[in-house]
Each structure stands twice: as structure tokens, then as C-alpha cells.
Regions:
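Nucleotidyltransferase catalytic core that binds NTPs
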Residues: 1-197
């Protein structure tokens, strides 16, 4: 079986796909899916999904995916799973960036990072053998784990709170008010790289 070394971003995307975080997306997107999601925020089957989920590969490594049933994924020198490639393609990055972010200039961190991705994209299902601990992963619950917690606690009404900022007193006030009205509160911090100043 061919293998490829993947980045931390790719590793986290593999985990999110495999554990169902990106539901209803179950595999790295093909060209039609990426274009439809970027232009209309829906999958070809008309289910809503806001952002392309892609697996990028360099020109040097793309040969590892050609005529392969599956390709081993290596992260931090350990095999973490495999990808079953279904399609290899090149997309129009400027067009995708314009559709997703509203412009295609490199002064936006998301656009800049997207432009830094490799030339080729591979679609296909991923299987992850085991999560490698990365700082916060012990607090990262899969959708199925969250559903079990909700069942165990017998919550009937649940509200979500999503933030990209460090929690402060205003957040605490809002969360306490929400818990007066709802059985449970799920906090979803958006964690990622920040723009360098």
C-alpha cells in the first residue's frame, strides 16, 4: 500500500470526517461537491453544507494515489489510517476563494491558507485507526459521544453556544441565562490559527 505524510490540518480533517463532525459529509469532496458547496452552500444532494472539505496533495506525491485502492496516512511518523481515493482533480482556487470568502485577495487568513494548499485534490472516504492526542483532543467529543451524554443526562431541550473568543463575563452571563431556560448547554469553541500581527 502506498503512503503519504499528512499535515496537522489534514489529520484533524480526517478525524472530523471519520467521527461524523462534518455530517452529512462523509468523505473528502470531489470537484462537483467542492464547486456546489462553494457556489451555493449545498451539496449536490441539496443538503446544506457551508465549506469545502478537501484533501490536497503535491505534484510530487500525487503518484501515490494513482491506481490505488487505498493510501496509508502517516502523521507524526505513525500510521493513523487510510484514504480510499475516488477522484483526483485540480480546482480553480481563485474562483473557490471568491465564492467562499467573498473575495480572493491574500490579505484574508482563510484565503491565504487556501492558496497555500497543494496543487492536486483527492476525494474519497477516510478511515482513522486511532486519535493521536493533540492538546485539546481529550475534550473533543464526537457527535455520537455528545448524543450519548444528552441521553444519559435525559436532556429534552439543548442550546448551543459557539465562540472563537476566550470566554469572559459576558459569555458566562449568557450561558447562565440559557441554562435557566434549557436543560443542557453545549459549548463549541472555534479553535484554529489566528492572523499574525
Amino acid at each position: 500500500m502506498a503512503s503519504i505524510v499528512i499535515s496537522k490540518r489534514q489529520y484533524l480533517e480526517c478525524i472530523n470526517l471519520y467521527q461524523g463532525t462534518f455530517y452529512p459529509v462523509k468523505a473528502f469532496m470531489n470537484q462537483e461537491e467542492i464547486n456546489t458547496v462553494a457556489e451555493k452552500m449545498v451539496l449536490p444532494n441539496k443538503k446544506v453544507f457551508p465549506l469545502p472539505i478537501f484533501f490536497d496533495v503535491s505534484r510530487k506525491n500525487i503518484k501515490n494515489f494513482e491506481n490505488q485502492d487505498s493510501v496509508s496516512l502517516i502523521f507524526n511518523r505513525k500510521e493513523i489510517g487510510y484514504l480510499k481515493p475516488s477522484d483526483i482533480y485540480i480546482c480553480d482556487k481563485k474562483k473557490i476563494a471568491k465564492s467562499v470568502y467573498g473575495f480572493n485577495g491574500k490579505n484574508h487568513l482563510g484565503v491565504k491558507k487556501f492558496y497555500e494548499t497543494e496543487e492536486f485534490f483527492v476525494s474519497g472516504e477516510v478511515k482513522v485507526f486511532k486519535k493521536k492526542e493533540i492538546n485539546f483532543l481529550n475534550l473533543d467529543y464526537s457527535p455520537s459521544k455528545i448524543k450519548k451524554i444528552i441521553e444519559q443526562k435525559k436532556w429534552k431541550t439543548i442550546v448551543g453556544f459557539q465562540t472563537r473568543n476566550i470566554p469572559h463575563l459576558g459569555h458566562e452571563f449568557i450561558q447562565k441565562k440559557l441554562l435557566e431556560k434549557y436543560d443542557g448547554l453545549i459549548i463549541n469553541p472555534l479553535v484554529g490559527e489566528r492572523k499574525k500581527k
